[in-house]
Amino acid sequence: MVLLYVPPVQNLLRREVTAYASKATGMQIQVERIDLRFPLNLLVRGVEVIQQPDTLLSLESLNVRVQAWPLIKGKVEVDEVTLSRVAVNSADLMEGMKIKGVLGRFFLQSHGVDLSNELAVINQVELSDTHMQLLMNDTTTTPKDTTASAPINWKVALHQLKLKNVSFSMQLPADSMRMTAHIGEAAINNAQADLKNQYYDLKKFLLSGTSASYDTGTAQPTEGFDASH
């Protein structure tokens, strides 16, 4: 176990694992650097997954810092999860849909996740310069799942959420429907969710520089209210 913290061993494992994964999947998988520091501080840089002619994933950096001792007590203390400059393209991996987009920066800090009591405190979440597209090629409905699911009793407290320059678009070519939404800036402070009792509240919600659009069909928009645009 101690050997995992030795840089030459980390480099050897990085080369062997990426070579095996590339051969097993038929993709070109590259990882520039993997750095694991004591006790649980993981840094990954320069990830690229290519399935010709598409680049399915490129990631500049991922940094995860988790406190080790609380895990023994069934608690999770996340000092940092940071993702920087990520690009995804599902290409033809998922039947009936395609996801493509970029993520500029994502940051999460969470102190107070109690697994046994189903409690979670999320101190800070930030997402910026992120733009995702969803293209649905098949609108066939799937049978409703009637299997009973286990009850969810989690209580979640979110102290601070910030969004900046975030957009999402969805297109259904079969019926020419297009939806887009862009958030210039948004912030949520002191939000709570009790999933068992379906109770939700928040103290502050701020939104600015935001737009949304909905279009269906190929006809040009008409003056006044137009339900298709």
Model-based region annotation:
Residues M1-G26:
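N-terminal type II signal-anchor transmembrane helix
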Residues R33-M136, P151-Q171, H182, A187-T216, ...:
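Flexible beta-edge/linker motif
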Residues N137-T140, A219:
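Short aromatic-enriched loop/helix-cap "lid" or pocket-rim segments at secondary-structure transitions
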Residues T139-A148:
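Intrinsically disordered, low-complexity segments enriched in small/polar residues
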Residues Q220-H229:
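Short, intrinsically disordered, charge-balanced linker/junction segments flanking boundaries
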